[in-house]
From Swiss-Prot:
Annotated signal peptide: 1-21
Protein's UniProt name: Leu/Ile/Val/Thr-binding protein
CDD domains membership: PBP1_ABC_LIVBP-like
Highest taxon of the lineage: Bacteria
Function: This protein is a component of the leucine, isoleucine, valine, threonine transport system, which is one of the two periplasmic binding protein-dependent transport systems of the high-affinity transport of the branched-chain amino acids.
UniProt organism field: Salmonella typhimurium (strain LT2 / SGSC1412 / ATCC 700720)
Family: Belongs to the leucine-binding protein family.
Gene: livJ
Amino acid sequence: MKGKTLLAGCIALSLSHMAFADDIKVAVVGAMSGPVAQYGDQEFTGAEQAIADINAKGGIKGDKLVAVKYDDACDPKQAVAVANKVVNDGIKYVIGHLCSSSTQPASDIYEDEGILMITPAATAPELTARGYKLVLRTTGLDSDQGPTAAKYILEKVKPQRIAIIHDKQQYGEGLARAVQDGLKKGGVNVVFFDGITAGEKDFSTLVARLKKENIDFVYYGGYHPEMGQILRQSRAAGLKTQFMGPEGVANVSLSNIAGESAEGLLVTKPKNYDQVPANKPIVDAIKAKKQDPSGAFVWTTYAALQSLQAGLNHSDDPAEIAKYLKGATVDTVMGPLSWDEKGDLKGFEFGVFDWHANGTATDAK
């Protein structure tokens, strides 16, 4: 291998300081900044560990994988700029993006430019419903997660008066509507369905409305910054309402915001892959670097790299890799993964968990 090239820039930062001519560059795109940067931390932790492990075992036919980090801040406009930067940098493989609202516009560019994208986090069904050939994911869909939440609400919680809140974004509103649809199919109507503004911090009006309407259950579609504030302010006002949210709220930063008010929150998310015995060596390696292995996107990202590895061992052509994966079963840290023709995982299941004030989650009963 020859021709050392230093990878640097305001947007792109290499996880490895040097790349060589025979190295295989992989764009790892997520939020390094902005209100949900914690999810980017999970993604980059998983990517770094997966690439280290793949390279330690010989890489791709002797060539090393080199990750190049890009920050889209989970912002659609910045995601488009990043996607164009990836194109200009000549990278053919993308792990990312994270948020559905930024993943979808970026995927338009990747598809047009012949770049393979495997997202470890974007759950919007629309992403893979457009006939694209180069888009896959290693997570489930809102159309899976919403019914899982609705089923638990109907069968386990059985509340009397339900409100559904969302952050007016593709991910949050899509999930909220999926939950609402699931409840309606179960014969239950919600008292109100409404949106808040992402970034908002004062929820006194919402809390007053919940109290006035005697709401005993709230489903929130969105991310942890707003969920944390809603929990904290609701408990401060004396509300005993049960709250529930998706994997977008299941972040230790939620507990930092809500404190003890986070205890007992219900969340739907992928299983706790850090608790799988076979994954212990990976958990130990991540902990040795003073990083947190518990985040869901650590593992969906690791699995995305394993999937890319399987594809690259077959071909270096993005279209051929996508075609290969849609007919293959890949052994990963999440278990065996296989995809349908749209690029969605077959048989992916979300679980329901109790969230605790210390930032951990246990299986809900």
